[in-house]
Every structure is written in structure tokens, then in C-alpha cells.
Amino acid sequence: MLLLSVNPPLFIPFIVAGDPSPEVTVDLALALEEAGADLLELGVPYSDPLADGPTIQRAAARALAGNMTLPKAIHLVAEMRKKGVTIPIILFTYYNPVLQLGEESFFALARENGANGVLIPDLPFEESGPLRELGERFDLPLISLVAPTSKQRIERIASVAQGFLYCVSSLGVTGMRETLPESLGDFVSEVKRHSRVPVAVGFGISTPEQVAMLKEVCDGVVIGSALVQKVEQLGERLLAPEEKEAAIAEFAAYARSLAAPLHAPCSLR
């Protein structure tokens, strides 16, 4: 069961499995936990990532060029556990690779290798019932996305939410944004009003200032593109034996700077 403490709010980083290599992905996961991550989203690269912006698309292309697959990504979770990663790990994967592997086989393999949840961004809520049942059976919650929509739809999604609810901060694909919608606070408050599980916000979160603002209204902040871009910038240094340690330390320091506002004292609401 995925039980999350949300005081202070959760820092939920996202990285892509296999970018820049499987081995470095494990090292990055360790660095993120040491930097204060409460939960890790491990993105499974896919050739047609409809929900992802250019930064994560490029990372997926690099990982696919290195022959990363869904089964290999799942086995990376086991490697992370062997190396000492203890925080919950959520597999972020598109539906087609799950279908190819087999839905039940996917949940069984994920559970066997130490994953703690699943997020499938292109799975419509109306079609998610069978996978939610598999999630309950394997104690591997299917995390639901909820975007700005009608109160009735928010209530329906929240009523069956498992693990935590992932609020999409703005419509469109993932990617860093200079500003967040003014209506975001009201949207998150509406979701929290109906939710029995923690409510996290993602898509576009890329600065400590945005994190500081969001900690006042939600239970967790997901940061993806900013961290994936940092991996891209570090590039070959992460793969060079003589530079790898320093590059990972730089990545960890950047992650720590993004998470820092979550652990600062809250202002009065």
C-alpha cells in the first residue's frame, strides 16, 4: 500500500529510465533520494509520447536509442532497490507498451521488482477500471491524472483515486513554464475537497518560486522537465568515469535547490 506523509508537502521528481544510461539512471535515483525526494516517478520512454513536451521527448529518444524497454525499465527499479533507494517509485508509462507486455504481466512484474504505483497518462479515466482493479489486486495503485474540468468529473475521478491524485497544472504537454495559471489554486482546492488521497501538482513546475507558491495549496509537487533538462545539460559528463561523480553531485544540488521551499516554514493561509 502506498501511504504518503504530506507534512511537509512531497517532493516528487521525474527522470527518464535509460537517459543517459541505465546505470546512471540508478545513480540519479539515489542522488534524488539523498536530495530530499519523497517519491520518484520513473518515466518509461515511448516513441509517441503525446503528453510530453520537447525536453522529455528528447530524453525518451536517447533512452530508446540505448534500447530501453518497459521490461528493462521495470528491472531498473529492482536495481535501484539493490543500490539502496528506499522511497516509493511510480512507473510512468504510456498504455501501448503495457498492452504489448500484457496488463496482468505488467502489474506482476512491476510488483515483483519493487515498484509502488503506476501512472498511465494516455489511459482515459472512463477506460481505467480494469487496470485499477489490477492495481488493487497487486497492491500497486493506478495513479489518476485530473485536469481542469467540471466539478462532477473531478468528483468522479477523486472518488476512486488510489495512492495520490496528480493535478495537471495547465492543459497541454509537459514542459517548463514561466508562469502558472492564476486559477490553479482554486482548481487544486476543488480537487482536495473531493479527494481522500494526497493531491500533487505537476506539468510546468520548474523554479523554486513556483514550488514555494504551490506548497501552500497542495500535498506534493512533481518536477520533471527541469530535471530532465539538467540531465541533458550534464550529458557526456554523466557517462565519463572521471567526471561522473561531480556531475551527479551537480544534479543533486540542483534538485535540492528546487525542493528547498517545501521544507521552509509555511506562511499562514
From Swiss-Prot:
Instruction: Look up keyword ATP-binding and say if it applies.
Output: no
Q: Which GO terms describe its cellular component?
A: cytosol
Q: Do you know which Pfam families this protein is assigned to?
A: Trp_syntA
Q: In which pathway does it act?
A: Amino-acid biosynthesis; L-tryptophan biosynthesis; L-tryptophan from chorismate: step 5/5
**Catalysis performed (reactions):** (1S,2R)-1-C-(indol-3-yl)glycerol 3-phosphate + L-serine = D-glyceraldehyde 3-phosphate + L-tryptophan + H2O
E.C. numbers: 4.2.1.20
Keyword Lyase in the entry? The reply is yes
User: Where are the active-site residues found?
Assistant: 41, 52
PANTHER family on file: TRYPTOPHAN SYNTHASE ALPHA CHAIN, CHLOROPLASTIC, TRYPTOPHAN SYNTHASE, ALPHA CHAIN
Oligomer and partners: Tetramer of two alpha and two beta chains.
Q: What does this protein do?
A: The alpha subunit is responsible for the aldol cleavage of indoleglycerol phosphate to indole and glyceraldehyde 3-phosphate.
Name assigned to this protein: Tryptophan synthase alpha chain
- This chain is encoded by the gene named trpA
